[in-house]
C-alpha cells in the first residue's frame, strides 16, 4: 500500500485528513508530525481516534523519510523546505497551506509578508483544482491545494469564464464560512462568546484569498479578472456558502445558463448543479467532498447570481487533497470520498 505522511496533523485540517485517510482502502497512514505535540499519541490529542490508530507524532524529517506521499497542513512559510526535501527524494507533496498557491513571488510577499524560500520548485507546482487542472495534476509531484473560499468561487464561475459570458471587472463574491476555517489556534474572533449569536464580515477588502481567486479566475478567462471579495464568519463549525454576483456581456436566459452548467459539470463526480428553483445549502454538502451550485437571475439588474456551497474542511481542504492524491496515484478519483451528507 502507498504510505502516507501528514505534517501538521494536529490542526483541524490535518486531523480531518487523518480521519478520511484512515478509511481509504488503498493507502496506509504511516507517520504523523506535529511541532506542538511531538512524542504524543494522536488519540491523546483527538479522542475520536481512540482504538482507530496508535500513531505517535514525530519529526517532519522522519515523516518524509518514511512515506511516499506527504501532506503538509502548515501555516504559510513552513511548507517550502519540506516540499523541496520531498521532491529531492522523489516523493509526492500535497501542500494544503498557501505557499504554492500564488505564482508570483511579488504577490506572495505583498499578501503574506514573506519571500519564497525555495523559488526553484515553484515552477514544478500545479494548482490542485481537479475540475480545472486534472491533466496537469496527473503528471505532477507538487500540488498547491486550493483555499476553501477560492474553491467555491472558482467552481461557481468557471463555466461562465471559460465561455466568455460575463464582464470581468465587476464580480462580487460574498462568502460565509464556519469557524473551523480560522484554524485551531485560539483567537478573540473565534472565542465562543465573540462568535456565538452573531454574524459579521472580517478582513474586508484585505483577505489573503483575494489574489488566489483573481489569479485562478484570470487563467480561466485568459484575461485579467477583478473581484470584490468579502468573507464572513458564521456561528457554525463547518461549511461555506458563496454568493457570487456577475454581469453578463449580453442578454442571458437562465435556462440556457443552467444548461451550460449542467453540460459543463456532467462528468464531475463532486460538482452538482441543482435544478432551477432550488437553492444551494451548506446542510446538503456538510461532511462530503461535494460542491452544490444553484443559479439565479436578478431580472431588474440583468445580473447572474451563483450560489456555491462546500464543506470547508473537506472539498475546501482535506477531501480535495485526497482527490488530488487519487488522481496522481491513478486511483478512482472518488476513492475514500464516497461521502453522503447526513439528512439532519
UniProtKB/Swiss-Prot annotation:
GO BP, sorted A to Z: L-arginine biosynthetic process
Keyword Oxidoreductase: yes
GO cellular component: cytoplasm
Reactions catalysed: N-acetyl-L-glutamate 5-semialdehyde + phosphate + NADP(+) = N-acetyl-L-glutamyl 5-phosphate + NADPH + H(+)
Active-site residues from the entry: 148
Molecular functions (GO terms): N-acetyl-gamma-glutamyl-phosphate reductase activity; NAD binding; NADP+ binding
Intracellular or extracellular location(s): Cytoplasm
Entry keyword annotation includes Oxidoreductase: yes
Gene3D superfamilies the record matches: Dihydrodipicolinate Reductase, domain 2 (3.30.360.10), NAD(P)-binding Rossmann-like Domain (3.40.50.720)
InterPro entries: AGPR_AS, AGPR_type-1, NAD(P)-bd_dom_sf, NAGSA_dehydrogenase, Semialdehyde_DH_NAD-bd
Pathway noted in the entry: Amino-acid biosynthesis; L-arginine biosynthesis; N(2)-acetyl-L-ornithine from L-glutamate: step 3/4
Entry EC number(s): 1.2.1.38
Main location: cytoplasm
Keywords, alphabetical: Amino-acid biosynthesis, Arginine biosynthesis, Cytoplasm, NADP, Oxidoreductase
Alphabetized HAMAP family for the sequence: ArgC_type1
Job of this protein: Catalyzes the NADPH-dependent reduction of N-acetyl-5-glutamyl phosphate to yield N-acetyl-L-glutamate 5-semialdehyde.
Family according to the record: Belongs to the NAGSA dehydrogenase family. Type 1 subfamily.
Protein name: N-acetyl-gamma-glutamyl-phosphate reductase
Species for this entry: Clostridium beijerinckii (strain ATCC 51743 / NCIMB 8052)
Amino acid at each position: 500500500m502507498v504510505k502516507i505522511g501528514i505534517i501538521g496533523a494536529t490542526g483541524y485540517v490535518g486531523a480531518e485528513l487523518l480521519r478520511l485517510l484512515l478509511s481509504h482502502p488503498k493507502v496506509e497512514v504511516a507517520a504523523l508530525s506535529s511541532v506542538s505535540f511531538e512524542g504524543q499519541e494522536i488519540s491523546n490529542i483527538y479522542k475520536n481516534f481512540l482504538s482507530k490508530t496508535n500513531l505517535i507524532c514525530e519529526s517532519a524529517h522522519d515523516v518524509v523519510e518514511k512515506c511516499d506521499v506527504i501532506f503538509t497542513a502548515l501555516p504559510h512559510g513552513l511548507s517550502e523546505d519540506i516540499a523541496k526535501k520531498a521532491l529531492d527524494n522523489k516523493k509526492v507533496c500535497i501542500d494544503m497551506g498557501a505557499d504554492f498557491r500564488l505564482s508570483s513571488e511579488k504577490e506572495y510577499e505583498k499578501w503574506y509578508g514573506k519571500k519564497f524560500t525555495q523559488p526553484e520548485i515553484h515552477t514544478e507546482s500545479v494548482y490542485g483544482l481537479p475540475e480545472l487542472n486534472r491533466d496537469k495534476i496527473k503528471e505532477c509531484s507538487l500540488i498547491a491545494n486550493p483555499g476553501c473560499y477560492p474553491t467555491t468561487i472558482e467552481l461557481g464561475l468557471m463555466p461562465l469564464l471559460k465561455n466568455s459570458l460575463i464582464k470581468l471587472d465587476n464580480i462580487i463574491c460574498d462568502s460565509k464560512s464556519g469557524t473551523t476555517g480560522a484554524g485551531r489556534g485560539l483567537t478573540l474572533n473565534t472565542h465562543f462568546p465573540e462568535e456565538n449569536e452573531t454574524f459579521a464580515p472580517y478582513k474586508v477588502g484585505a483577505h489573503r484569498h483575494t489574489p488566489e481567486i483573481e489569479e485562478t479566475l484570470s487563467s480561466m478567462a485568459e484575461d485579467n479578472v477583478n473581484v470584490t471579495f468579502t468573507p464572513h464568519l458564521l456561528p457554525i463549525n463547518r461549511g461555506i456558502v458563496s454568493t457570487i454576483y456577475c454581469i453578463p456581456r449580453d442578454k442571458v436566459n437562465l435556462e440556457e445558463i443552467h444548461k451550460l452548467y449542467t453540460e459543463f459539470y456532467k462528468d464531475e463526480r463532486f460538482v452538482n448543479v441543482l435544478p432551477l428553483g432550488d437553492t444551494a445549502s451548506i446542510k446538503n454538502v456538510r461532511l462530503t467532498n461535494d460542491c452544490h451550485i444553484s443559479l439565479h437571475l436578478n431580472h431588474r439588474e440583468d445580473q447572474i447570481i451563483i450560489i456555491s456551497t462546500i464543506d470547508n474542511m473537506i472539498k475546501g481542504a482535506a477531501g480535495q487533497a485526497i482527490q488530488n492524491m487519487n488522481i496522481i496515484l491513478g486511483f478512482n478519483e472518488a476513492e475514500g470520498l464516497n461521502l453522503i451528507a447526513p439528512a439532519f
